[in-house]
Amino acid sequence: MKIIGHRIGGNIVSDKSSRFGDVFNPATGEVESKIALASIPDVDKAVNAAKKALPVWSETPPIQRARILFKYKQLIEENIDELADLVGREHGKTLADAKGSVVRGLEVVEFACGIPHLLKGEFTEQVGTGVDSFSIRQPVGIAAGITPFNFPAMVPLWMYPIAIACGNTFILKPSERDPSCPIRLTELLEEAGAPAGVLNVVNGDKEAVNAILDHPDISAVSFVGSTPVAKHVYSRGSLSGKRVQALGGAKNHMVIMPDADLDQAVDALMGAAYGSAGERCMAISVAVAVGDVGDKLIEKIAPKVSSLKVGPWDDPEAEMGPIVTKESLDRITTLIGEGEKAGAELVVDGRNLKLQGYENGNFIGGTLFAVSYTHLTLPTNREV
């Protein structure tokens, strides 16, 4: 079976790992590969590689770093189908959704290509008698990024292109559920001309995260994920003096007023609620219908939810793919059952969906509740 190792200093490394996890294909429910889970020595090795690359990279002229990023942008565009397939195969997103997420990340690479202008300092003459003032922008050193499962291409691309464009080196800890796309993105950056060690990938769980947060040679950490983990990253990382950015989760509602264009509202709601199987912080999980618009809304949206085309990532007709893990699927079906028990009307029940040839996949159909003010438990549950 394929072993997914860490990418450190331009090489795939797994021989020092004593712990391994499973990477599943959520459409089939089968183990696609084994992944090496980093411990402290693995993180130390990545830090040493980043430290070795830092002097040369930080002294590389910004315009030269930008040229490498322009080439990187080109390589991502040329390999976008492969990258989207890696995302879909391990996360479950439809190929169209996966490709769109790569494109959103690519926009940050394009922004990073303009870094020479953004790195200009400031100079002010005579701020006081005989006193001039100036500021310069310099790399902070080694930065790290800890990213979630739901956007294995887009969120890493939010982070490291800017960091490395500014002359820093970087250590990425992607989700252990879908690591292949981040590793491939690292290979493409090296192919574009970035020296080995500028971008390193360590796979792992909480042990790897804590090793990154505690390491004295890592100067900055960025995180995107759930709110409890964001609090942990912020508190533990800042203890050692790191610059920490921690973006927690979100809970989104759509409010539909009585004078709304319901056709437009339904189209927007279908994409926002069921895109990426709802596994994103931008997802709409609750729509608040004001006044008497609720019944009209249900009448219009229920047929669309019922006919939502669910399928594997590589089905070009699929509108929604599987849930990323069996555990997440079980949690969702449990919440649906709890909603029923609380008295909410289950208008469309997507449970127990089985697709021919994918009977072991983590699939659930579109599901729709109608909830009145007397049954508010479901829409106020943070887990929904």
PLM segments and residue spans:
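N-terminal Rossmann-like NAD(P)+-binding subdomain of aldehyde/semialdehyde dehydrogenases
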Residues: 1-131, 324
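Residue-level signal for inorganic ion chemistry
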Residues: 29, 65, 87, 109, ...
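Structural signal for hydrophobic packing residues in well-ordered secondary-structure cores
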Residues: 54, 58, 73-80, 84, ...
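Rossmann-like NAD(P) dinucleotide-binding subdomain of oxidoreductase/dehydrogenase enzymes
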Residues: 121-264
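ALDH superfamily catalytic-core signature
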Residues: 228-373
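Conserved small/polar residues in nucleotide/adenosyl-binding loops
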Residues: 374-380
